[in-house]
């Protein structure tokens, strides 16, 4: 089966008292293995909410998400956590690196959480940091790195477990345009090398166009799919 992810009629409604706000209004799409896909849309259109549901960080109010042939909402919390650790990678606009740990320790963290011994985890982290051009910065903490370097560390951390899919939420939102382009080029290179699929949320049309396929989200709906 070539489909990695299937999203069918996903809705999300938040309720505060008597007020209901529907953020997602029946989102459906499929993502193939190794595919590079972007979702573009303005702030508040539902992009980040969708990504949280796809990553098993939030539940849909209606609809279904299948990942690796499994319905995410039917899995226990422990099984969802295992999928996040072993099969999914996450990159955000803010890097969310641990401030008191070095680049090497940050990248090794998912491996250690998964039970790998320290020496092997650090060796894998070292190799991946070298691949993203930061072999000379492994001992530096996030405060000692530039914005682009911090995002490269975050991408390395997302890829260290060789996930099937990386979910990236505005990964270049805090970067200048030149650095943003380099981050997107890096994601394409890593995709070609590893076969990891990327689903990237952005508001930048030029960057979105670098993906194999790009979708447009407006008012909680995917209204346009191009490049398929």
UniProtKB/Swiss-Prot annotation:
Every copy of the ABC transporter domain together lies at: 5-228
One CC-aspect GO term: plasma membrane
Q: Which family does it belong to?
A: Belongs to the ABC transporter superfamily. Lipoprotein translocase (TC 3.A.1.125) family.
**What is the protein name for this chain?**
Lipoprotein-releasing system ATP-binding protein LolD
The job of this chain, per UniProt, is described as: Part of the ABC transporter complex LolCDE involved in the translocation of mature outer membrane-directed lipoproteins, from the inner membrane to the periplasmic chaperone, LolA. Responsible for the formation of the LolA-lipoprotein complex in an ATP-dependent manner.
The Gene Ontology terms for molecular function here are:
ATP binding; ATP hydrolysis activity; transmembrane transporter activity
Query: Which organism does this record belong to?
Result: Vibrio cholerae serotype O1 (strain ATCC 39315 / El Tor Inaba N16961)
Q: Which UniProt keywords apply?
A: ATP-binding, Cell inner membrane, Cell membrane, Membrane, Nucleotide-binding, Translocase, Transport
- Gene symbol of the encoding locus: lolD
Task: Cite the CDD domains for this sequence.
Answer: ABC_MJ0796_LolCDE_FtsE (cd03255)
Superkingdom, taxonomy of origin = Bacteria
Residues where ATP binds: 41-48
Subunit and interaction comment: The complex is composed of two ATP-binding proteins (LolD) and two transmembrane proteins (LolC and LolE).
Which leading EC class covers this enzyme?
translocase
Q: Which GO terms describe its biological process?
A: lipoprotein localization to outer membrane; protein localization to outer membrane; transmembrane transport
Q: Offer one Pfam family short name for this entry.
A: ABC_tran
EC number, as in UniProt: 7.6.2.-
User: Where is the protein found, in the record's own terms?
Assistant: Cell inner membrane
Lipid metabolism is among the record's keywords: no
Q: How does it sit in the membrane?
A: Peripheral membrane protein
């Amino acid at each position: 089966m070539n489909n990695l992810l299937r999203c069918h009629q996903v809705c999300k409604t938040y309720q505060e008292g008597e007020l209901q706000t529907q953020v997602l209004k029946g989102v459906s799409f499929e993502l193939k293995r190794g595919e590079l896909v972007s979702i573009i849309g303005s702030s508040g259109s539902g992009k980040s909410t969708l990504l949280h549901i796809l990553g098993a960080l939030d539940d849909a109010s209606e609809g279904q998400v299948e990942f690796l042939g499994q319905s995410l909402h039917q899995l226990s919390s422990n099984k969802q956590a295992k999928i996040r650790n072993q099969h999914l990678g996450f990159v955000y606009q803010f890097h969310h690196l641990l401030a008191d740990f070095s680049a090497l320790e940050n990248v090794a963290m998912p491996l250690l959480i998964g039970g790998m011994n320290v020496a092997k985890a650090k060796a894998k982290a070292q190799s991946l940091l070298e691949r993203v051009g930061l072999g000379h910065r492994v001992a530096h903490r996030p405060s000692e790195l530039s914005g682009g370097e911090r995002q490269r560390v975050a991408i390395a951390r997302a890829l260290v477990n060789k996930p099937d899919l990386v979910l990236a939420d505005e990964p270049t939102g805090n970067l200048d345009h030149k650095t943003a382009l380099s981050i997107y080029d890096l994601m394409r290179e890593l995709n070609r090398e590893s076969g990891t699929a990327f689903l990237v949320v952005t508001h930048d049309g030029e960057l979105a166009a670098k993906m194999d396929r790009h979708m447009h989200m407006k008012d909680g709906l995917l209204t346009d799919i191009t490049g398929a």
